[in-house]
Swiss-Prot record:
InterPro entries: Aldolase_TIM, Elp3/MiaA/NifB-like_rSAM, LIAS_N, Lipoyl_synth, rSAM
Binding annotation for [4Fe-4S] cluster 2: 86, 90, 93
Family: Belongs to the radical SAM superfamily. Lipoyl synthase family.
Pathway(s): Protein modification; protein lipoylation via endogenous pathway; protein N(6)-(lipoyl)lysine from octanoyl-[acyl-carrier-protein]: step 2/2
GO MF: 4 iron, 4 sulfur cluster binding; lipoate synthase activity; metal ion binding
List of residues binding [4Fe-4S] cluster 1: 60, 65, 71, 297
Gene that encodes it: lipA
Domain Radical SAM core: 72-286
Predominant location category: cytoplasm
Upper taxonomic lineage: Bacteria, Bacillati, Actinomycetota, Actinomycetes, Propionibacteriales
Catalytic reaction annotation: [[Fe-S] cluster scaffold protein carrying a second [4Fe-4S](2+) cluster] + N(6)-octanoyl-L-lysyl-[protein] + 2 oxidized [2Fe-2S]-[ferredoxin] + 2 S-adenosyl-L-methionine + 4 H(+) = [[Fe-S] cluster scaffold protein] + N(6)-[(R)-dihydrolipoyl]-L-lysyl-[protein] + 4 Fe(3+) + 2 hydrogen sulfide + 2 5'-deoxyadenosine + 2 L-methionine + 2 reduced [2Fe-2S]-[ferredoxin]
Protein name in UniProt: Lipoyl synthase
Keywords (A to Z) from UniProt: 4Fe-4S, Cytoplasm, Iron, Iron-sulfur, Metal-binding, S-adenosyl-L-methionine, Transferase
Amino acid sequence: MTQAPPSPQAEGRKLLRLEARNSETPIERKPEWIKTRAKMGPEYQHLQNLVKSEGLHTVCQEAGCPNIYECWEDREATFLIGGEQCTRRCDFCQIDTGRPKPLDRDEPRRVAESVRTMGLRYATITGVTRDDLIDEGAWLYAETVRQIHELNPGIGVENLIPDFSGKPDLLAQVFESRPEVLAHNLETVPRIFKRIRPAFRYDRSLDVLTQARDFGLVTKSNLILGLGETREEVSQALRDLHAAGCELLTITQYLRPSPRHHPVERWVKPEEFVELKDEADEVGFTGVMSGPLVRSSYRAGRLYRQAVEAREGVTA
């Protein structure tokens, strides 16, 4: 789950029926373990000053991600592409739904230059779903990866993509840009999937990962806890993801962005996240990050290196 900055378009518009129902439940009080301490190392402080002086934009900073201190210290950052509005609505997501502005074809170049200016070692690219476009935004996702690689030789790039309606030709276009990691987030379990992600399909999301695996890419996904799933359903989702070809996994606690979003059904204790990591390791994932404040791009470069080491071990 990659957070995005609040969309100004969401302010003042009429609430959807679902949003009105969600708003009847007050924002939940967070438990004691949902907090982080700011550890501002030299790399973080350097990037913070650089981003401010150069007028750069990252999801990390604009969404107030709790992991920004660790990720920036590792010279890792996440960028949102495709605009501020998404053509689909997921009940956990902070990005507003609506009619996006025309595609900005210069965006890949600007993102690549931001990556170079920041001197990043690893960059994650994520963005909105663009069902309004013939190619659903496939060119944009692919071109951004290409531009980053061209301008920043040796950098790792993670491409966190929508499902592109599961169309093999669109997915292949994205795969051919050869990101170090191809990520597509499953997010939740089958029983509540349609309620939480009505424009996506559980099986189709798994198939996106399978197609990426078959193409030869390192694959990654995310599960959000606290949306109404059961522990047994999470275990099954782990097995489904691994069977689909997913190698890397992040598991996180749902934090409600606003009253119009899905209420938090439960606060998962830290020890359960530890248990789930152990279970995912046993299932066969090559890299797992599991914790209340983990996000899908958290320590992304470290997870990628684990996948590379695992693959090298198999071929050695």
